[in-house]
Regions:
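Short alpha-helix carrying the canonical HExxH Zn2+-binding catalytic motif
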Residues: 67-84
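Catalytic Zn2+-binding segment of zinc metalloproteases
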Residues: 79-96
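Sequence contexts marking disulfide-bonded cysteines in secreted/extracellular proteins
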Residues: 39-46, 95-97, 107, 134-136
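Second-shell loop/turn segments in exported
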Residues: 61-65, 92-99
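Auxiliary, metal-adjacent structural segments of Zn-dependent hydrolase domains
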Residues: 1-58, 63-64, 68, 115
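Post-HExxH zinc-binding segment in Zn-dependent metallohydrolases
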Residues: 94-129
């Protein structure tokens, strides 16, 4: 993925409201168990990537390959979170609705990216729909 990080960042910028930042995030492949431990408290889950704003790093499942447009879509999604932090769109201690707005934006950019490559976006479409009910629980 390292060799296409600039291209994926450019795609995230093109499909979002953000300007190109001066710096790029770091990107690091990790095993799936590390994602589970970090994001899901050690319980099996479908986590594939996340952006760590403290380390300025996108961590992604080492099974994702640069040749997969779906995998690239996950990285573009996380690039949006990087851009949100770079442009101060994330407030300190956001509430549920604010977090879901940020997440929706990342999914919408991922959706645009995939559609631009003529890839069906059923999973992303479903995630966007589900976000609207998360904070009402």
């Amino acid at each position: 993925m390292q060799e296409i990080i600039g291209t994926l960042l450019l795609m995230a910028v093109n499909f979002s409201q953000y300007d190109m930042p001066e710096q790029h995030p770091l990107i690091e492949a990790v095993n799936h168990q590390q994602l589970i431990d970090t994001l899901c408290e050690g319980k099996e889950c479908n986590a594939l990537a996340y952006y760590d704003d403290k380390k300025n790093t996108i961590f992604y499942d080492d099974k994702l390959t640069k040749d997969s447009m779906i995998a690239q879509g996950y990285i573009v999604h996380e690039m949006v979170h990087f851009l949100q932090y770079q442009h101060d769109a994330v407030i300190e201690e956001p509430d549920c609705k604010q977090r879901m707005l940020l997440e929706r934006e990342a999914y919408q950019v991922q959706q645009r990216f995939l559609r631009s490559h003529h890839i069906m976006t059923y999973d992303v479409d479903m995630a966007i729909r589900l976000l609207s009910g998360v904070c009402s629980r």
